[in-house]
């Protein structure tokens, strides 16, 4: 600041003196209103100091309030960020627990389904075996019936050819005697 004032006074001192036309330095204090200017500047300085002081104080208060508000917002944002980080970590832990539980549940379901499939397979095999056995027995019984029927037909044909009247009476008596013995035994 002092350099600026020194430069200004140097420029003013080098200006030509006198009453020439144009711009020149007038050394007469009364003509230049230097006293009036000094009084106005002094009055401005005296009355403007309180105004400037109040203005600067208000500005300082506003700046300090803005800084405090910014600090409070920073603290709130930091707290919210920390809370969000904590919630995120908690969510990650819960997600990991859910994943682990779902893996366990999937394994349990897999084992259960494998057991059910095994049981169903065993039951189907047993049913197949029972069906095969039933069909085999049915086929065997059918074959037996056919064999017996054919044997009886052949026996009847042979007996018709071989039996005469006398032989038939003898067989009939023998059968009646056997039946009589059976009836006597059962009594």
From Swiss-Prot:
It comes from the Eukaryota. One of its GO terms (cellular component) is chloroplast thylakoid membrane. The keyword Transferase does not apply. One of its GO terms (molecular function) is proton-transporting ATP synthase activity, rotational mechanism. It is a single-pass membrane protein. The keyword Thylakoid applies. Pfam families: ATP-synt_B. It is found in: Plastid, Chloroplast thylakoid membrane. Keywords: ATP synthesis, CF(0), Chloroplast, Hydrogen ion transport, Ion transport, Membrane, Plastid, Thylakoid, Transmembrane, Transmembrane helix, Transport. In plastids the F-type ATPase is also known as CF(1)CF(0). HAMAP family: ATP_synth_b_bprime (MF_01398). Belongs to the ATPase B chain family. This is ATP synthase subunit b, chloroplastic. It comes from Chlorokybus atmophyticus. The gene is atpF.
């Amino acid at each position: 600041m002092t350099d600026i004032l020194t430069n200004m006074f140097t420029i003013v001192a080098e200006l030509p003196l006198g009453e020439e036309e144009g711009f020149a330095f007038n050394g007469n204090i009364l003509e230049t209103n230097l006293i009036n200017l000094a009084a106005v500047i002094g009055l401005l300085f005296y009355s403007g100091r309180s105004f400037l002081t109040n203005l600067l104080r208000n500005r300082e208060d506003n700046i300090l309030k803005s800084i405090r508000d910014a600090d409070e917002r920073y603290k709130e944002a930091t707290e919210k960020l920390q809370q969000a980080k904590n919630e995120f970590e908690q969510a990650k832990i819960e997600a990991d627990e859910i994943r682990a539980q779902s893996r366990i549940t999937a394994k349990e379901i897999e084992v259960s389904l494998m057991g059910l499939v095994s049981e169903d397979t065993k039951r189907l095999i047993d049913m197949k075996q029972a069906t095969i056995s039933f069909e085999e027995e049915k086929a065997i019984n059918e074959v037996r019936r056919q064999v017996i029927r054919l044997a009886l037909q052949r026996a009847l044909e042979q007996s018709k050819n071989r039996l005469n009247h006398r032989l038939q009476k003898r067989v009939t008596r023998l059968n009646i005697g056997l039946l009589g013995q059976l009836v006597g035994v059962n009594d």
